[in-house]
């Protein structure tokens, strides 16, 4: 919530209060004579759309003062808009994509050390609040592997892995703001 405090120099003055961020402007109130507040949740999507590649952006609150219909003057103050609760979301699964080892185990969820080929699949990937998806990576045994994204899905071909016991894999989805969604799975 933003609250704009008025300090009227005359009881005949009224004010128009406008929020500006990038190319977006929103009139908070006209004919204002006292303090006025704005619940920014009402316009959050429009604000987020102005900063698809950043988690914060400087804007302003502009107050134009009138005496009747005559403009007395305009003053403004800077504000900083912040992106919150906007880490990308996704689902993740893994499989052994080596048909020969799957034929031995009978289950692509079982990994044979130094033989199975680990493939990690991402689905339902979504960037939030006007961001776009940028990259996906997985860390296995301390090694990072970069995958490819195609819309809301992605694939990370890790390859043959040297794991002899249950191993935690960290999968990270990064958006255009640098925000990260992280999921952990055990293979």
Residue ranges with predicted function:
Residues 42-58, 157-166:
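Surface-exposed, short loops/turns at beta-strand junctions within beta-sandwich domains
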Residues 1, 84-113:
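Short, compositionally biased P/S/T/A/G/V-rich stretches that sit at domain boundaries
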Residues 59-61, 169-171:
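Hydrophobic beta-strand segments within extracellular beta-sandwich modules
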Residues 4-10, 120-129:
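Acidic, Ser/Thr
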Residues 13-15, 131-136:
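Solvent-exposed loop segments of extracellular immunoglobulin-like
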């Amino acid at each position: 919530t933003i609250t704009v405090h008025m300090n009227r120099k005359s009881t005949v003055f009224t004010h128009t209060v406008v929020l500006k961020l990038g190319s977006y402007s929103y009139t908070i109130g006209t004919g204002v004579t006292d303090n006025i507040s704005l619940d920014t949740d009402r316009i959050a999507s429009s604000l987020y759309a102005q900063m698809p590649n950043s988690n914060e952006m400087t804007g302003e609150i502009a107050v134009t003062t009138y005496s009747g219909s005559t403009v007395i003057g305009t003053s403004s103050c800077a504000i900083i808009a912040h992106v919150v609760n906007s880490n990308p979301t996704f689902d993740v699964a893994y499989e052994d994509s080596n048909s020969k080892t799957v034929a031995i185990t009978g289950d692509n969820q079982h990994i044979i050390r130094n033989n199975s080929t680990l493939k990690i699949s991402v689905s339902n990937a979504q960037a939030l609040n006007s961001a776009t998806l940028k990259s996906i990576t997985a860390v296995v045994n301390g090694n990072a592997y970069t995958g490819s994204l195609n819309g809301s899905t992605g694939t990370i071909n890790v390859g043959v892995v040297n794991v002899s016991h249950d191993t935690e894999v960290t999968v990270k989805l990064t958006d255009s703001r640098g925000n990260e969604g992280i999921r952990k799975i055990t293979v």
